Amino acid sequence: MTVSNIKEVINSDIYKVWEVVLNVDKYNTWRSDLSKTEIISEKQFIEYTNENYATTFTVTVVKPYKRWEFDMDNSNMNGHWIGTFTSNGNQTEIDFTEHVIAKKWFMKPFVKSYLKKQQIQFVKDLKNFLEQ
């Protein structure tokens, strides 16, 4: 299993950060790595990359303004994502951790760097959207 973590302080209050991060049907308006999202149910959604590669997410924990967790699955990997949100006045600290298992042995050496790249891009896009 590969674990990747990113922590960042965002210059926006926790209510805005939470609203944007959990509003998955609007991801394509601010995330540069996605073409669209599809809401399956209250607890499940699918993200499509710009190359139309699908990943299914199943929400497992929602503690408003504190914690969001989900399971992830696609043809290359499965795993679990944990996001914590901490208010500090008009700023919010986010702490996102992914635990991923590659389904194909030849992908294992690349998983950590791929996850880190994805996390960095997500946070960059989020900050650009919220801090504009």
Regions found by a protein language model. Name each.
Residues 99-132:
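A conserved amphipathic terminal alpha-helix motif
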